[in-house]
């Protein structure tokens, strides 16, 4: 899954961006109050371990 697709998925679950950094953006999940860092490389694939970790932190998986 690409970073842009991940961000689209997070938005569909009600998550939103709360901060932008040089290499990562910070997103907030209102479902459980979690904050996760998302890499800013829009066209790159997110590594499977990173993707699973992000989805677990926001309560999607």
Indicate residue ranges for each PLM-predicted region:
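Basic nucleic-acid-binding interfaces
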Residues: 2-20, 28-61
